[in-house]
Every structure is written in C-alpha cells, then in structure tokens.
Design a protein with these regions (language model features):
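Short, acidic loop-to-helix structural element flanking the phosphoryl-transfer center
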Residues: 30-31, 58-84, 124
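Helix N-cap/coil-helix junction residues
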Residues: 7, 42-43, 104, 136
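A generic structural signal for short
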Residues: 21, 61-62, 83-84, 115, ...
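A metal-dependent, Asp-based hydrolase signature
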Residues: 8-10, 19-55
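An amphipathic alpha-helix signature
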Residues: 1, 30-34, 92
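Pocket-edge positions in alpha/beta enzyme catalytic cores
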Residues: 21, 25, 62, 118-119, ...
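Active-site neighborhood of HAD-like aspartate-dependent phosphohydrolases
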Residues: 1-14
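Asp-based, Mg2+/Mn2+-dependent phosphohydrolase catalytic module
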Residues: 71, 75-78, 87-197
C-alpha cells in the first residue's frame, strides 16, 4: 500500500530498503517504516508510515499459525508432566502477543525474554535465568528450538541438552556437533519430539 500511495519505489525496491533497515535496527525496533519514508522521501510521511504498519500487522496476523503438530506436541509434553517455558530474543509484549495469537500461551509456565534479562540467546545468562525461574536442573532440561547457535549451542553451554526442529543446520554445524559430542538432536518435524521424550 505504501507504493500504491506515493512511495516512489517499486515493491521489490521498497522491500529491499526495509530489509536493510531491519538488519541495521533489529526486528524489535518500532520505527522501521518511519525510517523508510525518511530515507526514500527525505522526511517522515505519517500516512505512509501508518499504511506500512497496518499492512505489516494485517499480514502478520493472517500468516501467524503454529507449525503442524505443534498443539499436539504441547499437549503431549504437558500430559507427560513437563514444565514448559519460552526463551525469546523478542521484546516481552511481542512474545506474549505471538503466544496469545497462536492460542498456545496457556501451555507455558514461564516466558523469559532478552528484554527482561538484559541478555540475548545464546548468552548463558538468559538460560540460567530461565532455569532459575523454572526451578530447573540443567541436566534434566531440554531446549527445543530451530536455530543452531542461538537455541542449541546456547542451551548446551548452559548445561542443557537441545532438540533442533526444522533447522537449517549446515554440514559444518553437524560436524561440530559430532566432533564435540554435543547433546543436540536434530529432527525435521515438531511432532517427532513425542518419539524422543
């Protein structure tokens, strides 16, 4: 809508500039569209900013869905007595918004964010805080995530094991896991967690 209403770029160009801004400022920054209009027009255009924000939120809401088998896996884990937590590098309100929109918030006993802790995954501190909040023993705790460095290595460095789901793990990462004999299991589908735990 921004392009259709006066942003003098085609959609691919606008998206490219926006991606650069997001890379520079981070995904939690709240004024990506403000900067986009400043960069392209030389000044902030409130109407175009509003169009960008509304379009982004409408698309996000329309596309936000749990992966297949996520709900079944959460039900299974809770039925087996597991306490579940979220460790996220997203700001707190955004993480809660995701959990509420996905209707999975009630499965989680704790939500720990980098905003609250002052450290981001893979920093050991965020895992230590999560373990402390959940009264967890690292040797009996498992991080389930999709990012090798942030989720799996961070968890292993905190003394936990990890399960990587649907991850773009490189051959180099796999070789490192084998060489270091890291307690990291790689699976393709979240539903496979039920066969491991």
């Amino acid at each position: 809508l921004m392009v259709d209403n006066g942003l003098p770029l085609d959609k691919d160009e606008a998206y490219g500039v926006l991606k650069t801004i997001i890379r520079q400022k981070g995904s939690n920054y709240g004024k990506h569209f403000n900067i986009l209009t400043e960069v392209v027009l030389g000044h902030e255009d409130p109407m175009l900013v509003a169009l960008g924000m509304i379009t982004y939120h409408n698309v996000k809401i329309a596309l936000l869905r749990p992966f297949a088998e996520t709900i079944d896996t959460l039900i299974y884990l809770k039925s087996q007595g597991y306490r579940l937590g979220v460790i996220s590098n997203v700001i707190t309100i955004k993480q809660w918004e995701k959990l509420v929109r996905l209707n999975v918030y009630s499965f989680f006993d704790e939500v720990i964010t980098s905003e609250e802790v002052g450290a981001k995954k893979p920093d050991k501190l965020i895992y230590d805080v999560a373990l402390r909040k959940m009264n967890g023993d690292p040797e009996k705790s498992i991080m389930i995530g999709n990012k090798f460095k942030e989720d799996a290595l961070g968890a292993v460095n905190a003394g936990m094991s990890a399960i990587l789901v649907n991850s773009d793990v490189t051959e180099e990462d796999r070789a490192y896991i084998r060489k270091e004999q890291l307690d990291i299991t790689i699976i393709e589908n979240i539903g496979d967690v039920n066969t491991i735990l």
